[in-house]
C-alpha cells in the first residue's frame, strides 16, 4: 500500500507539472484508480479507455488489445513517441504500465503456465467528449468562433506532430477530444505501429507511425 501511495502521489505531481516526464505505473495502481476497470469511457481500434480517479484529478487509462504477435519493442517505441509529443493541442501522455505475469490455465486436458501481458497508457482526462459527437449535436446557431477555434487548434496540433516527424495516420473527428474550454486535443496518433492490418480495424495499410 505504501508503494501505491507513493506512485499515486507521483502521478498527481505529474498532472500539476507540465514539464514532468512520464514514468512507469504498477498494474496494481492502475486497477485501483480505475476501480478494477469498472467505468468504460471509450472504445477504439487499439483498446478500451477507462476512467481513472485520483484524489483531486481524473485520468484516462487506455488498456491495449494484446494479441499473440503484439510487439513489446514497438510498444517501447510508441511510448517514446508519446513522451516526445508535448503541445497544447495534443492529449498529454502521463504514464504507462507494462505488466507480465504467469498464470496457470487448462489446455488440452492439463494445466500449463501461460503468460498474461497487460499494456496500458495513461493520459490526461479530457471532459467534453470527441469532435464527432460534438458535430452530431451542434445546432445551426453555434458560434463560428467556437468552430474556428477548433479548426485552428487541430491545425496547430497536426503541424506540431509533423514538425516532430510523427505521422498520425488516422486523423478523424473521433480522434479529436475537447477540453473544458472546447480546445481541441489530438489523440491516438502513432499506435498503428503496434498492430497489423487485421488487428487495428482502422487502418487500410500498415505504415509506421514515426520516422
Whereabouts are the PLM-identified features?
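Helix N-cap/beta-alpha junction loops of NAD(P)-dependent oxidoreductase domains
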Residues: 194-195
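A short helix-coil junction within the Rossmann-fold of NAD(P)-dependent oxidoreductases
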Residues: 160
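Membrane-proximal cytoplasmic juxtamembrane segment of single-pass receptors
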Residues: 1-154, 163, 199-200, 204-211
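Catalytic-loop of the protein kinase fold
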Residues: 166-178
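Pre-DFG segment of protein kinase catalytic domains
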Residues: 185-188
